[in-house]
């Protein structure tokens, strides 16, 4: 009995669900019926408006052409009537002269004949008939105003509803990825002069090959493109690839999307490894800010344990020119934080080959700031540039302003304005580490070295802050400088 009731309950539940689905579908059908009526009325109204526009245009053209015929007729009529009137007057004068001549010839009075003959001769000389052109001033031919609308009639007969545009074809051979920009080029398989604009959609992905149906990243949309190419600028390549697709639109409808394509967007992506940072550095994703109170509690405990009453001196303090005596002879074996005067934080991604580029903007009021690379073995007490395991550019605004390149506890003063944005270019296999003005791409300094271990991006700051920008490609201008040998001419072998 209970089993039957349970089975009946399941049937009731199934029926209820099905009824709800049917009701929802009925509502959808009713809504579609309303939409059909509304959309039909709209397209009918649009059609009538278009034809009315054609009628108005044809009527306007007709009136203009009729006016041209009337004006031409009036002009010719005027000329011909004037010429006709002149000829009529000349004929009347000539007939009068002829009659006078005949009468004179028949006259019997020979005494007056010479005088009369002379007058007739003078009258003939001055007669309008002999000064009149007997050629019509205008033609009666109106063929230049004839029309033949056979071609236009065929065009009108071909009027129909707008066709759905074909799907564009993306041309990968003409498309380009460079300088954190993507230029996408496409073409239409067939000529279509009804296309009004194109719509481009793109999204980021970490998957190579054809785009997948389901992606975590949404499609980004760019509308109103009038040409068959478009350039996306200022991109951050924080994923390995990008998917693209394009569709064409006319006034009424859009066509199908093109076959999606995937372009590789190679760039160096990393995050700051907060587990390595000095306790006085507050790390937030790619931003770092000096926090004077960050390690206060730990410092107090350390002083109580060691029985020492002094605190650590600032980085690069004249009183602390040598590494801390607490520095361990061996490199860091785990993920220990930097400590003492090494106000350092590392990136979380190793560089073991290829070319990579990133930029960092630091607060100009920072008392000290450094950027470069380091081996993973850099000791937790070691400062950037003061051992053979790190290379950096260092800005010091404390007591005395300096801008130096540092490696293996050696420094070279740089004769260049200190930019607020520094670009770092690392060519691992070539053993080149170059620093640039991030805004102008002016080369500041290049280290030449033989890297024996994978590198990590490294940063240091004291009483200041900075922000790192990753996902950048090696700029074309940087590649050109390196190819021209500018890097070699700017290097300092004493620091390598």
UniProtKB/Swiss-Prot annotation:
Write one Gene Ontology MF term.
Answer: microtubule binding
Segments forming domain COS: 105-162
Query: Which residues are recorded as modified (Omega-N-methylarginine)?
Result: 310, 320
Q: In this protein, which residues make up the domain named B30.2/SPRY? A: 268-477
Question: Looking at the keywords, is Transferase present?
Answer: no
Any Pfam family? fn3
Query: Quick one: a GO cellular component term?
Result: centrosome
Q: Which PROSITE patterns match?
A: B302_SPRY, COS, FN3
Record's superkingdom?
Answer: Eukaryota
User: What is known about what this protein does?
Assistant: May be involved in microtubule organization and stabilization.
* The protein, known as: Fibronectin type III and SPRY domain-containing protein 1
Please give the organism. Bos taurus
Q: Which gene encodes it?
A: FSD1
């Amino acid at each position: 009995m209970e089993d039957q009731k349970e089975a009946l309950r399941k049937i009731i539940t199934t029926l209820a669900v099905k009824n709800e689905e049917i009701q929802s579908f009925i509502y959808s059908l009713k809504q579609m019926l309303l939409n059909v009526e509304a959309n039909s009325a709209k397209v009918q109204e649009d059609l009538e408006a278009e034809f009315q526009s054609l009628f108005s245009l044809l009527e306007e053209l007709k009136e203009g052409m009729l006016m041209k015929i009337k004006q031409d007729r009036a002009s010719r009529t005027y000329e011909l009537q004037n010429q006709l009137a002149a000829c009529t007057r000349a004929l009347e004068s000539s007939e009068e002269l002829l009659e006078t001549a005949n009468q004179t010839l028949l006259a019997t009075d020979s005494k007056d004949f010479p005088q009369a003959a002379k007058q007739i001769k003078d009258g003939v000389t001055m007669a309008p008939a002999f000064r009149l052109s007997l050629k019509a001033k205008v033609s009666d031919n109106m063929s230049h105003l004839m029309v033949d609308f056979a071609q236009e009639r065929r065009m009108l007969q071909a009027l129909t509803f707008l066709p759905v545009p074909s799907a564009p074809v993306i041309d990968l051979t003409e498309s380009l990825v460079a300088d954190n920009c993507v230029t996408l080029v496409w073409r239409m398989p067939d000529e279509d002069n009804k296309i009004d604009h194109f719509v481009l959609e793109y999204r980021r992905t970490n998957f190579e090959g054809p785009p997948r149906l389901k992606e975590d990243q949404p499609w980004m949309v760019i509308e109103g493109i009038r040409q068959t190419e478009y350039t996306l600028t200022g991109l951050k390549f924080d994923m390995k690839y990008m998917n693209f697709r394009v569709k064409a639109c006319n006034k009424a409808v859009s066509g199908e999307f093109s076959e999606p394509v995937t372009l590789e967007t190679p760039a160096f992506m990393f995050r700051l490894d907060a587990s390595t940072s000095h306790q006085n550095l507050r790390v937030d994703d790619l931003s770092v800010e000096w926090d004077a109170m960050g390690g206060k509690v730990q410092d107090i405990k350390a002083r109580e344990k060691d029985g020492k009453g002094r605190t650590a001196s600032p980085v690069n303090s004249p009183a602390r020119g040598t590494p801390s005596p607490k520095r361990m002879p061996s490199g860091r074996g785990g993920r220990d934080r930097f400590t003492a005067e090494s106000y350092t934080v590392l990136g979380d991604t190793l560089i073991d080959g290829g070319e990579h580029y990133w930029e960092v903007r630091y607060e100009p009021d920072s008392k000290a700031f450094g950027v470069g690379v380091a081996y993973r073995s850099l000791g937790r007490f070691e400062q950037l540039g003061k051992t053979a395991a790190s290379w950096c550019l260092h800005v010091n605004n404390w007591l005395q302003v300096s801008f130096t390149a540092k490696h293996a506890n050696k420094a070279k003063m740089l004769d260049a304005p200190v930019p607020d944005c520094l670009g770092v270019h690392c060519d691992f296999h070539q053993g080149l580490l170059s620093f640039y003005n991030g805004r102008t791409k002016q080369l500041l300094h290049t280290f030449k070295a033989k890297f024996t271990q994978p590198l990590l991006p490294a940063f240091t700051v004291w009483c200041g802050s900075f922000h790192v920008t990753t996902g950048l490609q090696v700029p074309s201008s940087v590649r050109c400088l390196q190819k021209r040998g500018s890097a070699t001419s700017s290097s300092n072998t004493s620091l390598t």
